[in-house]
């Protein structure tokens, strides 16, 4: 398959990708609000012979491409792209930059453009493949709700059962380089909201209060010791306090304090140990300060660990190596998290063991090489979720499109494709 995938891509008219990408980039929409974005995707899909189903779980879309007799044992492959943006003010200075206070600061505009490119390739080259390919455009990835929303809206019953689940994401790195690995690739994530219920009083009479601010401060300090003292050094865990708030007046001891903790792990047993330790610390600090009310502990925005299938990796990675050569490299584990894995997990153990998630570098190569030579990669290269994050379009969209086609054709490509 790999020997001619570039020829297949190059024979397909993808000249529309630049204008499409510029349009999405200049009109970013937040999680759950992707109405205009979804409309542009549906309009582009209208050019292809596919079954399109929209408004799944909000603004989710699937396009089902079938080639051959569905009764045959040909493979069914699902490839997903996320489509939502972030509440980030863009500072790239690009002439197509967003001006609405939101931004495609995580590259979802690139993901959608590349997946539509794959759709064009499938439609224009039906003599080169056989099977079923599902292009899934997912809303609300950034808040962790989109995949579950599509599943809750009946996704499994509305599409053919996939044999393989694929996704990709752009990251800082030399534009056009593809990074892949087997095993744990993205961390699992939990957000934990903790509310300490104290007793309010006048600021001049702290002895009549149960001060939740003090308790919350002690909790934050104690949380810092969990990873260093309870998680083995050979394991990975992060527990970061992202929110700490209490009170609104200088002379009132408040009745409540709120803490939000974000946790990341690569292993389910470590996750359970970390979460249990957090709950233990919260309750113990409340007890130590005489808090009589049970603290409120709420888990939300859970993202499962992204664990790449060894079998799928073994089939797709040789295609990447053949097409990209030295530009196909080993990925490292990332501490970021994703909700994509909820989709294969909805199909049980078979789905859980049949997914692959890879990365594509998007930084201008000269910028990356200069920063590497100066030893300033972590300080000077714009990263995802930054207002300065701007992919180098041409090499990035080409690599994303070719990587998508290579991975899909590894399963549905016919002899000589």
Q: Predicted segment positions?
A:
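Acidic/His- and Gly-rich active-site-bordering loop/insert found
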Residues: 2-104, 109-117, 121-130
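Active-site beta-loop-alpha junctions enriched in small/polar residues
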Residues: 29, 82-84, 140, 171, ...
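Divalent metal-coordination and catalytic microenvironments
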Residues: 24, 63, 79, 108, ...
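Conserved hydrophobic/aromatic beta-strand scaffold that supports enzyme active sites
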Residues: 62-64, 193, 357
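Metal-dependent amide/peptide-bond hydrolase catalytic core
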Residues: 214-417
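Histidine/acidic-residue-rich, glycine-tolerant segments that coordinate divalent metal ions
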Residues: 86-88, 93-103, 109-110, 127-243, ...
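Local beta-strand N-terminus motif with an aromatic residue
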Residues: 74-75, 161-163, 353
């Amino acid at each position: 398959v790999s020997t001619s995938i570039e020829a297949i891509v190059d024979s397909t008219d993808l000249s529309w990708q630049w204008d499409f990408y510029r349009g999405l980039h200049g009109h970013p929409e937040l999680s759950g609000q992707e109405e205009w974005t979804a409309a542009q995707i549906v309009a582009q899909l209208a050019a292809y012979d596919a079954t399109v189903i929209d408004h799944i779980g909000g603004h989710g879309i699937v396009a089902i491409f079938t080639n051959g007799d569905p009764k045959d044992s040909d493979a069914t492959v699902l490839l997903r792209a996320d489509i939502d943006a972030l509440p980030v003010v863009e500072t790239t200075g690009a002439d197509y930059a967003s001006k609405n206070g939101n931004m495609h600061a995580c590259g979802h505009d690139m993901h959608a453009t590349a997946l539509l490119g794959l759709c064009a390739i499938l439609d224009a080259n039906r003599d080169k493949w056989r099977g079923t390919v599902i292009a899934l455009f997912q809303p609300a990835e950034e808040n962790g709700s989109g995949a579950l929303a599509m599943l809750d809206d009946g996704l499994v019953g509305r599409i053919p059962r996939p044999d393989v689940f694929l996704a990709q994401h752009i990251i800082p790195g030399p534009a056009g380089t593809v990074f892949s690995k087997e095993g744990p690739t993205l961390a699992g994530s939990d957000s934990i909201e903790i509310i300490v219920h104290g007793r309010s009083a006048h600021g001049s009479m702290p002895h009549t209060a149960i001060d939740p601010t003090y308790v919350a401060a002690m909790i934050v300090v104690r949380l810092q010791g969990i990873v260093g003292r309870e998680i083995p050094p050979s394991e990975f865990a992060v527990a970061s306090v992202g929110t700490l708030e209490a009170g609104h007046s200088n002379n009132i001891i408040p009745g409540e304090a709120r803490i939000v903790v974000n946790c990341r792990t690569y292993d389910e047993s470590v996750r359970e140990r970390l979460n249990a330790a957090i709950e233990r610390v919260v309750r113990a600090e409340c007890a130590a300060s005489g808090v009589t009310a049970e603290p409120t502990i709420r888990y939300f925005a859970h993202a499962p660990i992204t664990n790449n299938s060894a079998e799928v990796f073994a089939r797709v990675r040789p295609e990447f190596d053949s097409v990209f050569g030295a530009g196909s490299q080993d990925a490292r584990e990332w501490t970021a998290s994703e909700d994509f894995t909820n989709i294969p997990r909805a199909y049980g153990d078979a789905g859980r063991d049949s997914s692959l998630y890879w990365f594509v570098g998007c930084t201008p190569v000269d910028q990356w090489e200069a920063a590497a030579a100066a030893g300033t990669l972590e300080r000077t290269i714009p990263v995802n979720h930054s207002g300065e994050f701007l992919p180098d379009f041409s090499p990035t969209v080409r690599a994303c499109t070719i990587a998508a086609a290579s991975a899909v054709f590894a399963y549905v490509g016919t002899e000589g494709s």
